[in-house]
Regions:
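Active-site-proximal segments of metal-dependent phosphoesterases and phosphodiesterases across multiple
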Residues: 126-127, 131, 154-196
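Binuclear metal-dependent phosphoesterase catalytic core
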Residues: 2-7, 104, 178, 186-198, ...
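N-terminal active-site segment of His-dependent metallophosphoesterases
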Residues: 1-67, 78-81, 133, 137, ...
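Binuclear metal-dependent hydrolase catalytic cores centered on His/Asp/Glu-rich metal-binding motifs
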Residues: 108-156, 181-186, 236, 243
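Active-site neighborhood of phospho(di)ester-bond hydrolases with catalytic His/Asp-centered motifs
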Residues: 12-14, 40-45, 69-75, 96-100, ...
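Metal-dependent catalytic neighborhoods of phosphoester/phosphodiester hydrolases
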Residues: 21-25, 46-63, 73, 78-93, ...
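Active-site-proximal beta-strand elements of phosphoester/diester hydrolases
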Residues: 7-17, 107-119, 160-162, 219-225
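Short amphipathic alpha-helices and their capping/turn segments at secondary-structure boundaries
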Residues: 1-2, 28-34, 87-107, 146-155
Length: 297
């Protein structure tokens, strides 16, 4: 038997690209997420030019969010060299910005890193040749090690990973082939296979696929705002998932006000009743949100 307290509902979105003129642009999205989820995940590119001024505007909108917020920064958030100030500004309104850090909510632990690029599989860049190439690969390796260290510190039954760059090729498919090496790295996948990770959320790939799996079957979700708009044109641009305490994978949320408990649709008011085991296949759905976001990765 599972009750509502045995399930954590996650809302996830990425690449909001807040600019100096974005005040209020995501208020409707944040309001609906607050009503629908237990935790909000933001997977990078929170600002457009990496300016503290942009982060302050986003922070004003996030201050009204009535649920915990967990975030990682993306490449745009590093553009102006103000990433530490951005993290502090967001932290002042309660956002848990992870960079090799962990955060726990009930039975779910969250590990977050920015990640980096380099390509996937046999096409991945190797540390050979000029120093700048070696430094490039080293950055990705360091991000992977940082993720591994964070996962090792989690003691929760379920482990969820946030990153900005993609850990698998599957969720960047749809992007121009020539930019694959700059969208993520399969080196980020390696730590996921060493731990019992429940699900992975990332952004960055604006034209990528909505979901995929690692080689070992871990579900990976691309929650880039632009990708959600493109992949689900009839759905608002954020996704909701229920993470049960048992071994079931994250399940889709059929609609606002309902919670899938152990694989059977129940209203929240009836969530304390008995239910069957969870689904054996990840399903996903978008829930209500608002327009906005940038086209750049």
């Amino acid at each position: 038997m599972q009750t509502a307290s045995d399930v954590v509902r996650l809302a996830a979105v990425s690449d909001l690209h807040y600019s100096k003129t974005s005040q209020g642009s995501a208020q409707a999205l944040f309001a609906q997420i607050t009503e629908s989820a237990d935790v909000l995940l933001l997977c990078g590119d929170l600002t457009d030019y990496g300016l503290a001024e942009e982060a302050k505007i986003l922070a004003k909108d996030l201050a009204a969010v009535g649920i915990p917020v967990v975030a990682v920064l993306g490449n745009h958030d590093y553009e102006a060299g103000e990433e530490r100030e951005i993290a502090k500004i967001l932290g002042d309104v309660g956002v848990n910005t992870l960079d090799g850090d962990v955060w726990e909510y009930r039975h779910v632990g969250f590990a977050g890193v920015r990640g980096f690029c380099g390509g996937f599989g046999r096409g991945a860049l190797g540390p050979w040749g000029e120093k700048i190439i070696k430094d490039f690969v080293h950055e990705t390796v360091q991000e992977a090690l940082k993720l591994e260290s964070a996962l090792a510190r989690l003691t929760t039954d379920r482990r969820v990973v946030l990153m900005h760059y993609a850990p698998i090729r599957g969720t960047v498919e749809g992007e121009p082939l020539e930019i694959y090496p700059f969208l993520g790295s399969s080196r980020l996948e390696e730590p996921l296979t060493r731990f019992d990770v429940t699900a992975v959320f990332h952004g960055h790939a604006h034209k990528g696929a909505a979901e995929g799996r690692t080689a070992t079957g871990i579900p990976v979700f691309n929650v880039s705002y632009a990708a959600l708009k493109a992949n689900y044109p009839d759905r608002p641009p954020f996704r909701l998932f229920d993470v049960p305490m048992n071994g079931a994978e994250p399940a889709d949320v059929p609609s606002i006000g309902e919670r899938r408990i152990g694989g059977r649709r129940r209203s929240d008011q009836r969530a304390s009743e008995d239910s069957s085991d969870g689904p054996d296949k990840v399903r996903s759905a978008a829930s209500s949100g608002s327009d906005g976001g940038s086209d750049s990765t």
